[in-house]
């Protein structure tokens, strides 16, 4: 079995949970902070965000954007869009990564963060583990922009 099954937040397809319970604004903010810093170590990171129509998607979009920009990343919003479009835009427009805010087929009160790497594929488990470590650690563990 892969180590991913023992991860605290990320599962087989991103970070999902009931909005404001298992997945909250601080989780999204800190995920954004980490991704903005991680992809911005060698150049100014370019990260695109898409979302579904769930009410909580709007607050998660704002929290991610705040975290990303606090780390110096340029953020591009696709707003409401289908999940595959984020992968397509990341790949064709040379973004460092993309984030889709959606819990797919899960109930309306759930939501999720699906992080897509620069090749348009699911983010590597090693990076997801580092995001989890940062979420559970101090905010100042990485520098602000």
Language-model features: where?
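Structural signal for hydrophobic packing residues in well-ordered secondary-structure cores
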Residues: 36-39, 68, 72, 90, ...
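Fold-independent oxyanion-binding glycine-rich loops
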Residues: 12-14, 52, 80, 101-104, ...
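N-terminal small/polar loop signature for handling phosphorylated ligands or for N-terminal nucleophile
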Residues: 46-110
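Generic alpha-helical secondary structure signal
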Residues: 26, 84, 125-129
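Gly/Ser/Thr-enriched, mixed-charge loops and adjacent short helices
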Residues: 3-5, 18, 113-145
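An N-terminal, well-structured beta->alpha segment
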Residues: 2-66, 70-71
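Bulky hydrophobic/aromatic "packing anchor" residues in well-ordered structure
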Residues: 13-15, 86, 131
């Amino acid at each position: 079995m892969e180590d991913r099954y023992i991860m605290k937040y990320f599962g087989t397809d991103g970070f999902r949970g009931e909005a404001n319970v298992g997945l909250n604004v601080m989780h999204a903010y800190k995920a954004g902070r980490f991704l903005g810093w991680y992809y911005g170590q060698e150049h100014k990171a370019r990260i695109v965000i898409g979302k579904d129509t769930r009410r909580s998607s709007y607050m998660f979009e704002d929290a991610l954007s705040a975290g990303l920009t606090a780390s110096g990343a340029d953020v591009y919003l696709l707003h409401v869009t289908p999940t595959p479009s984020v992968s397509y835009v990341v790949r064709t427009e040379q973004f460092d990564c993309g984030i889709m805010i959606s819990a797919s087929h899960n109930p309306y009160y759930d939501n999720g963060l699906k992080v897509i790497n620069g090749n348009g594929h699911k983010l590597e488990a090693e990076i997801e583990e580092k995001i989890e470590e940062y979420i559970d650690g101090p905010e100042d563990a990485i520098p602000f922009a």
